[in-house]
Amino acid sequence: MSYNVGNFSKYLPFNDNIDMIASMIKESEADVVALNEIDSLTQRLPYDELSLLTKALGGWQWHFGRAMPYQGGAYGEGCIVPGKVKILKRYTVALPQDEGAEPRAIAVIETDKYVIGASHLDHVSPVARLAQAKVVNAWAQENYFKCKKPVFYCGDMNASPESEVIETLRKSWDLLSETENTFSSRDPRVCIDYIFHYKMSAPVKKVSAHTMTEFHKGDVTQASDHLPVFVDVRL
């Protein structure tokens, strides 16, 4: 699953919303989740958000990819995986920043069976967004070319399916998720959230993919301004 959670406080109080999103993740039965717009111990949200979320999920593991300092803490991306998963490496890759744009990063968890990277490309500068996409491709090429494990890249690309940014990513990555609209959750008019598989890593079999619009234990129109995207694959 890939989900821009908007700091867990876009529309609802933080404590209520993080519990609801944890329930939604449980209901989805996702084995790994990439998350965008995460705060860590900021003035506006003085919580270690991923720590609280993974506790609510029953002891999952996490990595916070710090993109920039913010209000005394940090802001960035995250990946979470179940507690039983064997993690080999957790690290963060800085992405290029254009003038007037925010710093961005890739949060990476490498396990014994797969690699997951999460990022949130720039929303202000098309130049920065394209440069960031090229660095994402280079990161995969330099670290995971002919990798014997599948490598996944997920997140809010702030780019539509026909954009140069997505075309650039698709030179190195197969698009697994559907191109159904993901933003905004209350009036979805554009697809900007994606799940990719690196072409030069171990193959996977795509079973299904969909943008998630309904949960028994949560309301997507209250949880975030984005819709979560979900892909079921066999390794």
PLM region spans:
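Surface-exposed cleft-lining segments at the edges of enzyme active sites
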Residues: N7-Y11, Y91-Q97, H120-R129
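Conserved hydrophobic/aromatic beta-strand scaffold that supports enzyme active sites
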Residues: S2, E77-C79, R90, I106-V108, ...
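Active-site environment of divalent metal-dependent phosphoester hydrolases
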Residues: N7-S9, S40-L45, Y70-G72, V124-V127, ...
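Structured beta-strand-rich core segments of catalytic domains in phosphoester-bond hydrolases
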Residues: P13-F14, I38-Y114, V207-M212
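N-terminal, active-site-proximal structural segment of metallo-dependent hydrolase catalytic domains
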Residues: M1-A56, P69-G73, K134, D225, ...
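Loop/turn elements at helix/coil->beta-strand transitions in domains of secreted/extracellular proteins
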Residues: S28-V32, G58-Q61, D112-Y114, C147-P150
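Active-site flanking residues adjacent to catalytic metal/cofactor-binding acidic residues
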Residues: Y3, N36, S119, C154-D156
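Metal-dependent phosphoester-hydrolase catalytic domains
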Residues: V127, A131, Q141-F152, N158-L235
